[in-house]
Every structure is written in C-alpha cells, then in structure tokens.
C-alpha cells in the first residue's frame, strides 16, 4: 500500500532542462520533492524544483550529494554517467531507475541495436563503421542513401548524417568525428512513437503519436497517429518487446518507423520522458511526467486514456544568433480555446533550440487532428522571438 508523509519522498534528477522542470511540476501535487543536478546555474528545472546542485553530469561529488539527498535517482538526459551512478548507488544505497545498465545500453547506438535485434525487435539493417569503406560497403548492400550515426553523444537528431553516395563517405565520417554506425535508409510512411512506462509488475502505453521532423528535429506530434488499427497494435507490440530488454522502472520514449508497406521498425529509444510525449500533459488522464514519478517510486501507474485528440508543436529558437530569450506575440495562444503554452525558462535563445511548446486539444466533437494541426501551426507561426 502506498503511503504519503510530510515531507514526501525526494527524487534526485540528473539533468535540469525542460524535462526535469516538467518532472518537478508533475511531482509537486503528489507531495514529491525534486532536487536536480545540472551544470547550468538557474537551469529551467531549478525554477520549480526544491533545489539545484550545480555540477557536471559526470561529477562524482555532485552525484554523491544528489544521492544522499534523495530517496531515488533518475535522469532526464543520456549524458548522465552510468558508471558513476552505478557506483554511487551501490555505496549510498539510493536506487537508480531506469537502471544504469539500461543507460549503458542506450549510450551506444550500436550496442543498443545489437541487443534489440538479438531480442527479436525489428530494426533496420545496420553495421559498425571503422572507416569510409564500411559506409561504401553498406551502400553496396543497402543501396543509397544510408544514414550514418554517431554511436554516442547524439540526441534530438544530433550526430545523424545522411550519405547520398559513396563519394560522400569520407566527408560524412569526418563530420561525425567519433565511433559510428550506419543504417539502411528507411522508406517510411510516417514516424511514430510510443511513450511506454515500466512499473512494478505492470506496463502502460500511451496512445500512438505521429511525429513530424525537420532537419532531424521534432516539430510536431499528432495524436492519435493517422495509422491503421493494425499498424497501431503492431507498434504497441514492438514497444512492449523493447521494455523487456530495458532494465528498471520509468518512462521510455520509443521512436518507430511505419514503413510504406505497413511494417514497424525501431528507430531509437530514450530511457526518460520524451519530447514526443509532451502532449500528454493536457491530452491524457496522466501525463508522461507523472507516470515517470510514479514508476521510479514504485507507485501504481495512472490511466493513459486519451482525453481528446491533441497536437503539440515545438517552439524553436527563431533567431540568427544566441541572445536573451524573449517570446512575443503570445496573445493568440492565450486566447485560443484548447491551447496551452509551455515556456521552459531558458535564459538564452539559440537557433533551433527548444524554448517551449504549444499543445492544442479538441475544443469540440468536430475537431479533427487535421484541424488541430492547422491551429497549432498558425499559433506557432504567430509568436516571435524578440532580441
């Protein structure tokens, strides 16, 4: 039986960006306190968390301090050092969820794909890359183009380089600047994602989201995805198979390709709340952030039932160069029924930096996802980033 006391449990979060901020916002109504560790003073999460430890993500002293102040540790960024977290968890007795072993698997995309393929999860053909000849061999086997990926350090599309021909192999490899892998290019109908939650002896999945990317950056998520019922069920099956491989409680963002012939292939996994799940704050009974809080604490999971069709659009830094973050012309968002603005509190705007998002939910029975998408795009276009 779950019991609350005052003060309630404390979650220590490695990372203090927008995900940590929204975790802290979801934790507060449950009586749960959050302390974050982040190298940036006054990071977005620090504005709502109980406290911030200013330290690098792999700083052993900082993570030890975090562990000693928390009942459980989690992370909102894959740059967390799994070896440091594992060692400090063992020394302090503060559990980590998801487990550091899962973080280790996720850190290296080649290791990730091999483990998932061995478990029967459908993935695009791939191979390790030691030199440009490996890329050329992949083009021989898979056809052009292929996708070159940095094995470590890449997220939000960073470190992904399409290679159009053998002549481009050398330059592409130099641009990745580190260990790499290459995948066949997937001819997809749409990109989708399942936000899945692993709790104590229970699993939950949120409604399938359809994702629109530009320049490898998520722009929009549309829910429910415009996929067939059969494809949707297959996506859930693949997500559950992925959770079997992952070790530890928490939310997992599982990105998938829906191919033109109706198959589902795994793209990538994030062992944390995911940008393509931000819509759940308004769109479902329990948000992905509250689910993560519940899951890592070992509490019962909440309902993932859809409240209404929903569209989320990111607010990306529409600036030429870095400068103070100011968002203008937000009146239309504030005046639109069903629209919700989330501003992350980042002090500096940079080109294409995720500064916030807008969610639009159906205001009536006649609102289709296409109508909501049009509204969301209009609202995103109306705001301005001011110098």
Locate predicted features.
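Haloarchaeal acidic low-complexity proteome signature biased toward cell-envelope/secretome components but also
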Residues: 1-10, 28, 50, 197, ...
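ATP-binding N-terminal substructure of ATP-dependent carboxylate-amine bond-forming enzymes
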Residues: 1-102, 106-107, 133
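A conserved helix-loop-beta module that forms one wall/lid of the active-site cleft
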Residues: 99-161, 166-167
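Internal nucleotide-binding/catalytic subdomain
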Residues: 159, 163-254, 258-260
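A short beta-strand motif that forms the metal-chelation/ATP-contact edge
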Residues: 196, 263-273
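Active-site "cap" helix and flanking loop/linker of ATP-utilizing ligase/carboxylase catalytic domains
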Residues: 236-253, 270-319
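Peripheral (often C-terminal) accessory segments that flank ATP-dependent C-N-forming ligase machineries
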Residues: 294-387
